[in-house]
Amino acid sequence: VTAVLLIPICSAALLAALPGYRLTARLNVVASLATFLSALSLFVVERPTPGPYVLIDDLNIVFIVLNTFVGFTTSIFSASYIAHELETGRLTSAYLRFYHAMYQIMMFGMNLAFVSNNIGLMWVAVELATLTTVLMVGIYRTHAALEAAWKYFILGSVGIALALFGTILVYMAARPVMGEGQDGMVWTLLVERAANFDAALLNVAFVFLFLGYGTKVGLAPLHAWLPDAHAEGPTPISAVLSGLLLNVALYALLRFKILLAANPASIAPGPLMVTMGLVS
């Protein structure tokens, strides 16, 4: 688990400092491969005991391996794609280093969201992944690219603010049972005692969480950022948005869906999620 987080963040710092764009592209691929292999090892090594910040279970291990695999394959395509953008003059060598460094920070944010056992830390990780992709969508610095990046940033900020409010409401629902402190933010502890939480407050919290993280998933009506972000950003980032970032937000929703399912008096979020998915 430590390697899945340390490799991307340490690689990002190194990528930002390296001078040669060819070397940065190769290091990005090597770092992505190492992260993927570390994720695969989670299937065979003994899983760590759930702590206040880190959790590995049957749900997130699939997401982690999928995330690192797509991240690795996309980094291979990125190497040639971004080099071509340098040759055509659309990007400078400085922006190439910036791209590869942001790529690894993005991978760190998404991996952190998947392994987090703290709903507050998970929110921070999703926000980090969002901000890095915003910067990468606008990397061409054209009017259309900057407009797409700003639209993505504004709608994403609205969504993440709603998700933050929903997270706070979950903590408020848990506080009478869990007491003060971080126990009210630890997902495994929340699920164990969710049956005793205020169901009405949990229901309201899920509405905000659904709207907030649903914006990241691309659910209607807050999906307007998707077409422009795909069209104006680099092609590898379009693949990352579809194959990875949307999954991170969906994973967060699934965690809260499980939490509500542990409270028999709360709403059943499944039909709502299916309906909005079909509408979108």
Language model: regions and residue ranges:
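Transmembrane helix-loop-helix hairpins at membrane boundaries of multipass inner-membrane proteins
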Residues: 2-101, 181, 188
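Alpha-helical transmembrane segments of multipass membrane proteins
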Residues: 12-17, 40, 108-112, 135-136, ...
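Cytoplasmic-side transmembrane-helix entry/capping segments in multi-pass membrane proteins
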Residues: 23-35, 90-104, 147-159, 230-242
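Alpha-helical multi-pass transmembrane bundles of energy-transducing inner-membrane proteins
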Residues: 98-105, 111-204, 215, 235
